[in-house]
Amino acid sequence: MIQVISSWEIGWNYPRMESDMWEMVLREFNVDCQCMMPKSGIKAHENQTFLMEYNDVAEAIDAARAAGRSIVFVDESGAEELEAFTHPADAAYVFGRTSQNLMQLYMDANQGDVSLKVLTPNNTGLPFGHQIAAIVLYDRFKKAS
């Protein structure tokens, strides 16, 4: 199972609009579950059949761990580079908000969790989560082919 966990870019966009940007990428790469926070109430929309909302990222990560998924933090400060990464079969990829360093979550990470980075020419951390998710999911697809 493939799961993606991230936060709404509150103040930049509306969750309803942002969910469409995420959904297009995630469905194309057969992601099973999209987990977003904080709760916005858009789950009731008929096209959001695989969207789950949580109060915060820790709650979503705890649920993924309880389901037996490997936690993969994707961040510009990640320890492992995407090129050398072997994707777990059951994975929950955690993306922060734009320019949000996930280092605090790494500090709370369980042994076995991975911190992954996608190198870009400027490595500023500015691409949106759904943009980096497309790169990570494409890498997963190509390595599985």
What are these regions (language model features)?
Residues 1-145:
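Post-transcriptional modification and biogenesis factors for structured RNAs
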